[in-house]
Amino acid sequence: MNLQYKYKSQDYDQFIFCLEAVPDVETSSITEVVKNLERLALEQGIASIYKTCDSIEGLEESLTILLYDDHNFKDYEIIYLVMQGKRNTICLNNYYYSFEEIAELFEGKMKGKIVHFANAKILDLDQEEAQYFLDITGARAVSGYGVAHKTINSNLLDKAFFSLCQEFDDVVEIVEELHQKHYALCKALDFRLYY
C-alpha cells in the first residue's frame, strides 16, 4: 500500500513531489517526512504529493506515473528525495545505486526541476558529476547536504528552502537568502546546490 497526500495550495502555483525510501511499501506508517509535508501545507500553503518506494523499480514506477499520468507535473518544481545512501549513491532495499544510474533513470525527465535530497544521505558531487547529472536529467539544479547528521534533521532547512523556491526563480538568490536566514543550520548541515 502506498500513502499519498495531496494538498490544495492557495498561495503557490508550484508543488513538491516527495519520494521516500522505506523498507516495505506494504507497511503503511506516518513518517516524520509526512508530518513535515503536512505542516508545510498548513503553515505555508505549499502543496505536495508524497509516495514511498522500496526498490529501484518502485522509484521508476512512481516517476513514470508522475510524468505520464499526472497532468500537473509541470507544476512540480521540486522533486524531494528522502533516501539513505553513502556519498553519491542511494540505497533501496539494501542495494546501492550510483548517481550516474539515477541520472540515467531520470534521463530527460527533470527538465526545469530542482532535485533535492534530504540529509538522510550525503550529496558530495564534484563539478563533473554534477554537470553530468544536470545534463542527463535536464534538471535545473540538484541540492542536498554535505553532512548526514544523526542529531540534526534537515526538515527545518528543507521547509525554508522549499518556501524560498516558491518566492524566487534564481537559484543563486534562493541560496543567498537561505544562508542569510539560516546561516548556522546551512553551515552545520553543509547545504549545497549545483546548477
Roles of regions detected by a PLM:
Residues 1-76, 114-118, 136, 140:
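A domain-level signal for caspase-like cysteine endopeptidase catalytic cores
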Residues 22-24, 86, 122, 149:
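Conserved beta-strand elements of beta-rich interaction domains across eukaryotes
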Residues 27-29, 90-94, 126-129, 153-155:
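A short acidic (Asp/Glu
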Residues 52-124:
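Catalytic-core segments of thiol-dependent peptidases
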